[in-house]
Amino acid sequence: KGYFDSKRNQISALNKFMLNDSYIVTGTKYEVKKIDAVLYTNINQKLSGIFSAKIPDQMINGSISVFDNKLILRSDVSVKMDNFVNFGDYLNLSGTETFNAKLSIDNNASLELSSNLSNTTFSSYIDELNKRPSDNLKTKILISDLSQPTYEIENNKFSAYINNNNGYFSLGSSFDEDIKKLNFIDGFYI
């Protein structure tokens, strides 16, 4: 189907694309299987639609859009927090959490995760870090380049930046201005 603009003498096509039981293997051998998608173009050349896929530990469903050479996938993903962070008595997470995920791919691939962590327990010798599952703690995790992952974590209890053995962990917001002045290539600051 299409649209003819007689003033511009231009035809714009509206197309539908369907993918059934497809798969992708990334350069790092990460497999995404059983991809089903329905995508539509519109007159501004944006591609959008819905998808479902199997990643190694779960099925995901979400939306997809492509515009100006940028691909954005949105979905909810489930993460076993026990496997995510375990620093012994200092900070241990437990529970299974659902995150809203946004994967953006243009010149690089980035991933943003957000959740209120309502299914996660924080256990720590430091009282300020403890959290019951019933307590909401709106948290955002940003991995700005998946090929060279660094983790920026931010919520009302703490903020952290983790890059290999470098970065920082800041409890509260008292040191926000000091953190902006630090160079994190020479160690991990607490």
Question: What is the predicted function of each stretch?
Answer:
Residues 1, 9, 13, 19-112, ...:
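Interface amphipathic segments
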